[in-house]
Amino acid sequence: MPDMNAMRIIEALRSGVPSRAVGKYFAEARPKLIRRISDALDEVAINGKSDSFLYTGKYGEGKTHLLNTAMTMAQENDMVVSYMPISKEAPFDKLPVIYRNIVQNTYLPKHEQPGFLHKLWGIGASSPLASEMLLYAAKELETDKLYYLFQCFLKTDDQEEQFRLQADLEGDFISPPDLKRIYRRIAGKAAKMNVPFSKTKHCMDYFSFLSRLFTAMGYNGWVILIDEVELIGRTGKKARQNAYRNMYRFLKPTSLHATYTMFAVSSMYQDDVIEKKHEYENLEAIFPNDMEPGKTVLDAIVSAEQLNPLTRDEIAEVISRIIDFHAKAYDWKPDLDVGKVVEVAQEGGSLLRTKLRSAIEYLDQKYLYGDGGHVSVGALEQEDLSAEEADVPSLDDLND
């Protein structure tokens, strides 16, 4: 009988679209790198010290697959995971937008669907978790807005208010007058905030708060996975520089607790963006008095570790797994020489993605016709990162 889970794995590999399921079952490749990430996750979980890892890779060589593998490893280590691919709809130059997108794509261990705030429903305002988080929000953040907001969230008996306060924690920020009004109704006194809250200036407080909240909830830490970083290169000059400054907050995570952030970047970024668009000169022109964040990120991309192509032995190991999944998916018993399938894969294209697709096409033909035939893939076009879009202020910029 066909195995539907195995069929999903095969179809994901055939399409070339990155899949969490594929990351779960194909973690054997690049064992040294996987071990290093595993050790880093253990260090974060044990000591609570935050860290980061930025790497580059060619198109189709497994950048996103590595993030999916890290996601599986983190969840097995009882860590919360957030995954954010950068896009036009989810840019990286505006921290409030980053926060909203990350919260929307945050997964608790052993959960297939995103979401975590429902775990706070019903927690008493005098519980150990509440006491820890209220003390943290009052003493450790730049502003004390979250102290008042979280207190209201825990104490309100009005469901509509609770949903509005939860929406704030999800990135739809409540106005200060509305928060003060809710606090006065609940506490019977005025909220005296130490610093007026600005979502563009103080949004990092929310990341810090969540990083502490996840460990207070009993999890071993927070893993943030940022994909498609090269799409920063398609934005305008100032937007790119702001994006680098935001990357710096996670690359050097001094304000985050027990957090591990991974950035996946195209290996073309140095040539197509940093050099061709003169990013170091742009940095000096836009932020002449505060160059360190941007320079640190640009230096990190230039010196980043690049994913090496898999060795023949590593490809053979992956293809052996693919043969097993293909047999389960279509309920057949392949009588195959693994070496022959590896040979077909090696001839099928230069990129890992096309090699695996060629191997699957060969298995399809063996299954359907008993003859593998000849499979080949032509050269793939690569995206041009040299074009850019003009800086256009968003509604968030205009309303802040």
Label every model-predicted segment.
Residues 2-7, 179-336:
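The catalytic "switch" region of P-loop NTPases
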Residues 36, 40, 66-73, 97-105, ...:
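Alpha-helical scaffold elements adjacent to nucleotide-binding pockets in ATP/GTP-utilizing enzyme cores
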Residues 1-51, 371-400:
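A short, basic N-terminal segment
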Residues 160-183, 294-300, 304-400:
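C-terminal alpha-helical "lid" subdomain
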Residues 42-45, 211, 252, 360:
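Alpha-helical repeat scaffolds in large eukaryotic proteins
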Residues 23-31, 60, 196-200, 237, ...:
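Conserved phosphate/pyrophosphate-binding and hydrolysis machinery centered on Walker-type P-loop NTPases
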Residues 52-53, 57, 61, 65-217, ...:
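P-loop NTPase nucleotide-binding core
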